[in-house]
Amino acid sequence: MNDILKIGKYELNSRLIVGSGKYKDFQTTKEATLASGSELITVAIRRVNITNPNEENLLDYFKDTNVKFLPNSAGCFTAEEAITTFRLMREATGIDLIKLEVIGDAQKTLYPDVIETIKACEILKKDGFTIMAYTSDDPIIAKRLEDAGADAIMPLAAPIGSGLGIQNKYNIAFIRDAVKVPVIVDAGIGCASDASIAMELGADAVLANSAIACAQNPIQMAEAMKYAVIAGRLGYKAGRIPKKPYATASSPIDGLIQF
């Protein structure tokens, strides 16, 4: 299926993005990522060793693959922190495709601070970054982020790592209608069916981390996510039948034997 996902100047064949946290080791991270078919893995900048060549480095495990790294600003709580983090990262690596995260509540929900996110987005866009912005499932905020220069909107389905699945299907659909840039459902995915539902709602892609890394069999779950995203995308493009309150016969009544 030739169905390219375009994010700014970047093109991806897979509509599944994966995370790198919570795995037992880097080798499992690599094997699960390859099983998922994903071409993009997000990594917290503060967790990646880019200065000490003598320490184990996740980046080294993917040198022989086509998987690209998507640096994120997890751990940043202000626009200024995120901006500084990404500028230093680009200077060290040359990577300009980023996942912008500015957290507002670090204790319970890990919900984003959308005001600080918008501020950071405006400045980073002027700096030439291609921005994928993590945000709430508010369609108004999604539009504001698009106006601020976001190349993709990443609304949460539920709190990060909760596995609750999509808590507000209507808002995800509203966001899809509100913006023209890709919508990538991020956070809260718990199983393959969650990913498929997100795609059926019109999301352009899904990001999954905990659902894969914390599964009993991460590699098998990664493969399940791969096919769930494909199935959901195909179903969305095919167009579902309308919901009706009553039955509609699937077989014609013409030619029935008359008693």
Curated annotation (Swiss-Prot):
Entry GO MF terms: thiazole synthase activity
GO terms of biological process kind: thiamine diphosphate biosynthetic process
Domain of life: Bacteria
Enzyme kind, highest EC tier: transferase
Keywords: Cytoplasm, Schiff base, Thiamine biosynthesis, Transferase
Keyword Cytoplasm among UniProt keywords: yes
Record-linked SUPFAM superfamilies: ThiG-like (SSF110399)
Record HAMAP family: ThiG
Function: Catalyzes the rearrangement of 1-deoxy-D-xylulose 5-phosphate (DXP) to produce the thiazole phosphate moiety of thiamine. Sulfur is provided by the thiocarboxylate moiety of the carrier protein ThiS. In vitro, sulfur can be provided by H(2)S.
Similarity section: Belongs to the ThiG family.
Subunit structure: Homotetramer. Forms heterodimers with either ThiH or ThiS.
Protein's name in the database: Thiazole synthase
